[in-house]
Amino acid sequence: MTMPIIMIIGVVFFLLIALIAVFITKYRTAGPDEALIVTGSYLGNKNVHVDEGGNRIKIVRGGGTFVLPVFQQAEPLSLLSSKLDVSTPEVYTEQGVPVMADGTAIIKIGGSIGEIATAAEQFLGKSKDDREQEAREVLEGHLRSILGSMTVEEIYKNREKFSQEVQRVASQDLAKMGLVIVSFTIKDVRDKNGYLESLGKPRIAQVKRDADIATAEADKETRIKRAEADKDAKKSELERATEIAEAEKINQLKMAEFRREQDTAKANADQAYDLETARARQQVTEQEMQVKIIERQKQIELEEKEILRRERQYDSEVKKKADADRYSVEQSAAAEKAKQLAEADAKKYSIEAMAKAEAEKVRIDGLAKAEAEKAKGETEAEVIRLKGLAEAEAKEKIAAAFEQYGQAAIFDMIVKMLPEYAKQAAAPLSNIDKITVVDTGGSGESSGANKVTSYATNLMSSLQESLKASSGIDVKEMLENFSGKGNVKQSINELTNEIKEAKTIQKSE
């Protein structure tokens, strides 16, 4: 009993598997780009198309259906569009002008149940190329018919209308085939006789003329705009350059004013510094001069003390003739030396003062010129004053020496003066470059050579007479008095009295 049950279960299972396999193999689906055409019995009523003859077909789109084995069959029908290139040979237009046309058409099977059923009736079982060839022949035929009903000008000027007319006429025949025209365009219309080219020449010329005019106008406007832009740019540049120049001028004026103020302040400071320096140096110079004046005064006092000391020494030794003579000579020499020292010191001091004043003048020349001139004037005045004092002191000492030593001092001075006097008297002889002596044969002093040498001795012998005649000084008499031929004792007494009187006068002063 178990075996029959197992067999029954096995048969049922097998049948179930077989049914599932049959269902899987017979269930058909349609994609979005196709339609499933089901024919046969037991089609039902959904998506079923019935034609005028009562024939029924089931059309499935975007879904699926079970195809009954033995009773039904299914075939897919592509709904994809097709591109058709259509062209015509030479076709005579309404005017009898032969033209050719090329176009492009996009066709597909319609989307309604009736259009799909019509297309299935026409093309089911045919290839895609067969379907496209049939549609192309229909389009080319209608394209030729439309070309023959229009003029060349209408075709050339209104291609849109030409395309629409071809599409309108061809759509009626293609609809009977279940096809629709998605788009139709005319790519080219041409002829072999140059008719279309001739039609375009006037327009081309007009267009070129208009283009040239427009180009010329555009160029003119461009040049005008460019000229205006250049003018505005140059104007802006000039204004900018003017502003920059004005700003630079203002800046330079400010800089010049600033430099002028700086230079003025610096000049004032330098002038003030130079003036202060000049005043300080002037004060230092004045102090140095005061110190030198004091030193000179001290030196004069020392010299006066030395003179007094020598006078005392002379007083102690005046009774001796030899000592008196020697003392007289020494005092004369001392007086002369004191005179020379005084003159040398005065000149040295004068030179130093003038050099310092000149250096001070050069250093503060310029801005402190007035102060330098003032300092120079004061310095020169001081030099003149000191020089006058020195000369006065020297003359005073000479006068004092004359008062003290009398004729001895005068004699000493004359003796020292005689060589210079003789030199100046014989100076004309030194200017003689050459002497030619002509000897006539005489002898003795009258001969030529002796006579020339006697000129000099005669000149020296006549020197005393010329000195006495010009100055009143008798050198011969002074020598006799000084050597003792005169009244020497009286002279000594007179000299002693003169010295005492000079001392009394100096003490009273």
Swiss-Prot record:
The keyword Signal does not apply. Keywords: Cell membrane, Cell shape, Membrane, Repeat. One of its GO terms (cellular component) is membrane raft. A motif (EA repeat 4) lies at residues 390-394. It is found in: Cell membrane; Membrane raft. Pfam families: Band_7, Flot. Its main location: membrane. A motif (EA repeat 1) lies at residues 342-344. Found in functional membrane microdomains (FMM) that may be equivalent to eukaryotic membrane rafts. FMMs are highly dynamic and increase in number as cells age. FloA and FloT function is partially redundant; double deletions have marked synthetic phenotypes. Flotillins are thought to be important factors in membrane fluidity, especially during periods of rapid growth in rich media. Homooligomerizes. Oligomerizes in very large complexes in vitro. Interacts with FloA, FtsH, FtsX, OppA, SdhA and SecY in detergent-resistant membrane (DRM) fractions. Interacts with FtsH at midcell. Interacts with FloA. Interacts in vivo with KinC, FloA, FtsH and ResE. Interacts with ResE, colocalizes with ResE in FloT-only membrane rafts. Another study shows nearly complete colocalization with NfeD2, but only minor colocalization with FtsH or KinC. This is Flotillin-like protein FloT. It comes from Bacillus subtilis (strain 168). The gene is floT.
